[in-house]
Amino acid sequence: MEPLSHRGLPRLSWIDTLYSNFSYGADDYDAEGNEEQKGPPEGSETMPYIDESPTMSPQLSARSQGGGDSISPTPPEGLAPGVEAGKGLEMRKLVLSGFLASEEIYINQLEALLLPMKPLKATATTSQPVLTIQQIETIFYKIQDIYEIHKEFYDNLCPKVQQWDSQVTMGHLFQKLASQLGVYKAFVDNYKVALETAEKCSQSNNQFQKISEELKVKGPKDSRDSHTSVTMEALLYKPIDRVTRSTLVLHDLLKHTPVDHPDYPLLQDALRISQNFLSSINEDIDPRRTAVTTPKGETRQLVKDGFLVEVSEGSRKLRHVFLFTDVLLCAKLKKTSAGKHQQYDCKWYIPLADLVFPSPEESEASPQVHPFPDHELEDMKMKISALKSEIQKEKANKGQSRAIERLKKKMFENEFLLLLNSPTIPFRIHNRNGKSYLFLLSSDYERSEWREAIQKLQKKDLQAFVLSSVELQVLTGSCFKLRTVHNIPVTSNKDDDESPGLYGFLHVIVHSAKGFKQSANLYCTLEVDSFGYFVSKAKTRVFRDTTEPKWDEEFEIELEGSQSLRILCYEKCYDKTKVNKDNNEIVDKIMGKGQIQLDPQTVETKNWHTDVIEMNGIKVEFSMKFTSRDMSLKRTPSKKQSGVFGVKISVVTKRERSKVPYIVRQCVEEVEKRGIEEVGIYRISGVATDIQALKAVFDANNKDILLMLSDMDINAIAGTLKLYFRELPEPLLTDRLYPAFMEGIALSDPAAKENCMMHLLRSLPDPNLITFLFLLEHLKRVAEKEPVNKMSLHNLATVFGPTLLRPSEVESKAHLTSAADIWSHDVMAQVQVLLYYLQHPPISFAELKRNTLYFSTDV
């Protein structure tokens, strides 16, 4: 038997549909970013996996990757005793009224299905039967029992809803209905056989074909339409659909029932029975993908699907890509009018027998795609973070739902643009009979997954073919029902009760790897998800000619709502004929890849957690620990009198008899000497062990500092400079002036802003000011090489802003409640402050001190 509903988002209950003004799933947004109205899903010909999750809780409906048991959802919390009880009971009546109306329609559908059964039975014993008794019992199995159960339920519930008062009870009716769900188990077990029997009988008997194609269903009592025509196949699907609907309404009822109401425990029990029933049904179902049959009778199954960015005619388009057993199909969601069933529009397809991956040389000849400017991507991230903060404030202040929906809509639009414009890793495919296609991905892990899935299918004996227009229409039509990825991967598609992810710093040590069959030049990369998509964050050095590399390299990775860590192991390619000049075209061979969930309970400890990840027969050992953002705000002064890290900048400059600390001058000099053209300088993490070694040398004032600097990786030197500023007992721009910097950057009038921002610089202690001005000029020189190093002023402000300017621990506790809020509330302003000074004409210390044009009251 095929699996019973759509995986991913469960269907909305009627009450959620009634009150939601805007939906943020992929179903409502087409590939060019236009809103679309969502129509109700139609009954599928094959049975989708029964959705046993509560409404709007995608994380509960998704089954585990390994095909294990589905997660049993927690019953929703009811209203606290006396809390908005009147409003809750009114909502309860609305829920029941809507459910009662749908129950009437369902009973009419069952009646229509039963109507031909009696005359068919009557002819079965004659000399010219339409169907045999056995065929009739197979097709209509348990329909009569289901009808009687629901008719009794409807007759008992209807008067209670029509004569409504706050004391009415009906929990016992739902409890009884749930206790009779066993009859559905028998129906589900027989469903596929019933469909096949009905289809065979239609093909062999014209009389039954006419009956099954036009069954008359009575309209509701208040409806203008007296009857509608429905096929028998569609009506046989209705009980499958209904069993999920009953569970959804129990969630809605519990949500709007006070916990001290007599119905509450009865409804809880009914929900428990229903969920257990759905779980038991789904455990019995073969978890194979629902299949589509080709005209030749071959089985075509969906293997993989997902959202990818395609470059088409020079512009980026979001596509939904479907990989079947013999064909790759690229589609976009059609724009449809309200109430119409949503469909996909096929943009192109390639039979896997004709699909080839171009060589690096062929890829190099392909038109290159210019990446979206980094500063614009950073601006989008800042906007998203600010909108998240506004939404949290509205919720905390119990703001109007319309205002929250407007903010959510804005956030979705910005996240959609970020998702569309951030990917840069090319994934090229070619049809040997014609055109080439280009997708852009944000993760090499994801590119590898698609490539491997296609290559695995291509090992089979595949034949080339051309789909007729009808065949293509049927295949494209099946995509809506078969898809496993329902939503664009953006954070605004998450429910409020889902984990927001981790915000802070993840320290990862990549120790070693085992399991390689022959010696190779090996390295690892680390990816984490951020804003809904994965990005590469760190890379180990290459360990040459070995089967057991021992890297023992530590990295500090900033997390922004992250939930997963990916580790990829590569064999380095030194053959220049295979190296693509495109920076984003990774041609090194992936030896293995793996992913782990960043469980807050596991990683949010002060201690290191060591683990092993297995990938393709390879075992990589690593350790990690996590520091939350609020913890990272704490600056611990150094207990030792000597050294430079964690020591006040005024103490260091006085001891050294210098205006700028020696460590700052030496790191800046080395970066400008040999790192100013390094791609991603200051953004790419240096090896943590190298940084710690440099820290120890500077703290000890070792005479070999200069020699060590000249031999050290430039990213480690850049990382040492960032670490120095981060470990200052207070940030370079001081705790005292932090609120004033926040207010100054928010001023609208340019003259007032200039006056305020210059006065604030003058208010800094001399060592802080001179060091800040020295760093400013250095960062401007780095940005001058942006065409080569890809580091704009905005990128540099994003890296250094939160390090040089941070709220004090007291300040952050007084105003903010969560780590996510700290990030979204402050980082935008911190970046803007530094960017203001970076974009300002050169500022001289002497001129700043004596200039009387800048005037302001004391801060």
From Swiss-Prot:
Residue ranges annotated for the PH domain, each copy included: 301-459
Region (Disordered): 27-84
Entry-linked SUPFAM superfamilies: C2 domain (Calcium/lipid-binding domain, CaLB), DBL homology domain (DH-domain), GTPase activation domain, GAP, PH domain-like
Stored SMART domains: C2, PH, RhoGAP, RhoGEF
Modified residues (Phosphoserine): 57
InterPro entries assigned: Abr/Bcr (IPR037769), ABR_PH (IPR037865), C2_dom (IPR000008), C2_domain_sf (IPR035892), DBL_dom_sf (IPR035899), DH_dom (IPR000219), GDS_CDC24_CS (IPR001331), PH-like_dom_sf (IPR011993)
Record-annotated site: Arginine finger: 683
Subcellular localization: Cell projection, Dendritic spine; Cell projection, Axon; Synapse
Span of domain Rho-GAP: 647-845
Composition skew (Polar residues), residue ranges: 54-64
Pfam families per record: C2, PH_19, RhoGAP, RhoGEF
GO MF term (any one): GTPase activator activity
Keywords recorded for this protein, A-Z: Cell projection, GTPase activation, Guanine-nucleotide releasing factor, Phosphoprotein, Synapse
Protein's job: Protein with a unique structure having two opposing regulatory activities toward small GTP-binding proteins. The C-terminus is a GTPase-activating protein domain which stimulates GTP hydrolysis by RAC1, RAC2 and CDC42. Accelerates the intrinsic rate of GTP hydrolysis of RAC1 or CDC42, leading to down-regulation of the active GTP-bound form. The central Dbl homology (DH) domain functions as guanine nucleotide exchange factor (GEF) that modulates the GTPases CDC42, RHOA and RAC1. Promotes the conversion of CDC42, RHOA and RAC1 from the GDP-bound to the GTP-bound form.
Name this polypeptide is given: Active breakpoint cluster region-related protein
Source organism per UniProt: Bos taurus
Gene name of the record: ABR
